[in-house]
Amino acid sequence: MPHITDRPIKSISKELEFLKQDLDSKIPPKKLDRNILIATWNIRAFGNLTRKWISRGEDSPKRDLHSILCIAEILSRFDVIAIQEVKSNIRALRDTMKVLGNHWGLILTDVTRGSAGNGERMAYLFDTRRVQLSGLACELVVPKEKLTKIGVDALQEQFVRTPYAVGFRSKNQTFILVTLHIKYGKKAKERKPELKAIAHWLSDWAKNISEYNQNLIALGD
């Protein structure tokens, strides 16, 4: 059985070279003291994988080592990435971290239980040569008194998948990323309550000068 750290087969190596060239043309390079590249990616059902270079029709899941190499190559172009739909099984995530290398860090939530939560986590991957954790990590919860207020498109319960806020530091700058995975629902209007709630939450945070930091960026889908 092949492992993610093994040399890939020739066809995959060739494809990875094409991918690198394409990424070079589309994503700006990392520059010391000049930029910080932040991304968000919903990697659908990012959990288990088949430990073959290329999965076949009978294999489950279809995600294979070839896929992980491609995912890791894309992730490596950024400094911090918020990832949604990380599952309870983190085999694919572990292999991705092996490809990225020892200078990459990871912080993630526990699994959201219940049918609506879909057994998902949220995670941040970050290049420790470029950014470090600032010390803040929290899940955002709406105060009970706000839940009891009835209004148009108001949130009447907690988030199905709790938004995850983590602070990062680069040189003398600190910023807080908030990743969320909004309840999709059957209609667009079903998404409004959670979107409005997170907007109000971040607005209140940014206005309070005594809070940990006011540089806030919301990510996700």
Regions found by a protein language model. Name each.
Residues 1-219:
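Divalent cation-coordinating acidic motifs and surrounding scaffolds
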